[in-house]
Curated annotation (Swiss-Prot):
It is a single-pass membrane protein. GO terms for cellular component: mitochondrial outer membrane. Its main location: membrane. This is Bcl-2-related ovarian killer protein homolog B. Expressed strongly in ovary and more weakly in eye. Little expression in other tissues examined. A motif (BH1) lies at residues 113-132. A motif (BH3) lies at residues 67-83. One of its GO terms (biological process) is apoptotic process. Keywords: Apoptosis, Membrane, Transmembrane, Transmembrane helix. It comes from the Eukaryota.
Length: 211
């Protein structure tokens, strides 16, 4: 291969890398898509119904599908550890789910407190579990429209607080490392992270209720 051919290949590879660089808009969009899938899974599990289909919003595809599966599996593991923590969120926060601003502010307050001491995948999964638990409450109490408020609030939270962290890890694909080739030490690390997240979540509930 001559120097010009090598230069062309290198240029193409650089363009490819640049194209794979996630923008803020892409990360927020992906985060909201994952949130819709997570919420839809939890609502369906509870025997309720809610359509996550919105105009001009394509279904997740490619690697985002794998990310969604992993996120749900990690959520299952976290919820199994403390099943009552991520249920009846509205009651725990003592809020009415009929007011959009109240639902949004409550979720953002909890999410912000959860990562106050740093961000981990365990905490990110916990935030999704909180969003889903709150969404289930909204549907069960007759306010399914609030599900979209929760999804939008999560998107805003990601934009404010998670985008730089996600970029450093190459995007959502990094979460796949939590379950791929998981050895015993990695499993213990995930569980310890989840327990820490649970403790911080309980503390967050207390902080919110005593404001």
């Amino acid at each position: 291969m001559n120097v010009f051919a090598r230069s062309s290949v290198l240029a193409a590879e650089m363009i490819d890398v640049f194209d794979r660089t996630h923008t803020e808009k892409e990360l927020v969009f992906q985060s909201k898509e994952l949130c819709r899938d997570f919420i839809h899974s939890r609502i369906t599990r509870e025997g309720l119904s809610w359509s996550k289909v919105e105009l001009d919003l394509p279904e997740p595809r490619g690697v985002l599908v794998d990310v969604s599966v992993v996120l749900l599996k990690l959520g299952d593991e976290l919820e199994c550890m403390r099943p009552y923590v991520y249920r009846n969120i509205a009651k725990q926060l003592n809020i009415s789910v009929s007011v959009e601003a109240v639902v949004s502010d409550a979720f953002l307050s909890v999410a912000t407190e959860v990562i106050a001491m740093g961000i981990t995948w365990g905490k990110v999964v916990a935030i999704y579990a909180v969003a889903a638990g709150l969404a289930v409450d909204c549907v069960r109490l007759g306010h399914p429209v609030m599900v979209h408020t929760i999804v939008d609030s999560l998107g805003e939270f990601v934009r404010r607080s998670l985008v730089p962290w996600l970029k450093k890890r190459g995007g959502w694909v990094d979460i796949l490392k939590c379950v791929v080739n998981m050895d015993s030490r990695a499993h213990v690390h995930w569980l310890s992270t989840a327990v820490l997240t649970w403790r911080e979540f309980i503390k967050t509930m207390y902080v919110y209720l005593t404001k």
